[in-house]
Amino acid sequence: DNFIGHKKKLKKELLPALIRWMEANNYPFQFITEASIDLSDDKDLMDMMVRAGLAKVFVGIETPEESCLMECNKKQNNNRDLLDCVKTIQNYGIEVFAGFIVGFDNDPPNIFQRQIDFIQKSGIITAMVGLLNAPRLSKLYRRL
């Protein structure tokens, strides 16, 4: 799920081994993974990912609306410039594709245009926009 969830092991064991294998085999393919937006905070990790052949990363951005990020408890996305974070990852040569959600209680009336503007400004080529749903037994489901 979140590729960077265990950074210590990733940076000391998995990525060095993967880099050696990819170099020895002349980079026969590329990898795609999923990570949280705070990947952009770790320059060394992004460098290692590129050297290991990780070409694309899926990031759950969800929304450019800060109050909605708080609503869905997306702490790693709060209090940061999401556009700048995406650009940082892209500048390392990693293509970002992302997931977005509409339907939060705090979505402003212009949320669709804000999503479009964010996607276009960020250069995200593949954006998956979905409607918020309430899985059974979730807090949202019980509230509704």
Q: Which residues are covered by each model-predicted region?
A:
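Generic recognition of well-ordered alpha-helical segments
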Residues: C85-T88, F118, L140
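Conserved SAM/AdoMet-binding glycine-rich loop
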Residues: D1-F104
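Hydrophobic alpha-helical segments
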Residues: K74-Q76, D117, L144
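Flexible glycine/acidic-rich beta-alpha junction loops that bind and position SAM and/or redox cofactors
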Residues: H6-K9, S67-C72, V102-N110, I125-L144
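Catalytic cores of alpha/beta
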Residues: D44-M49, D105-K121
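Short secondary-structure boundary/capping segments
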Residues: L14-L18, R114, R142-L144
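C-terminal accessory region of radical SAM enzymes
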Residues: Y92-E95, S122, Y141-L144
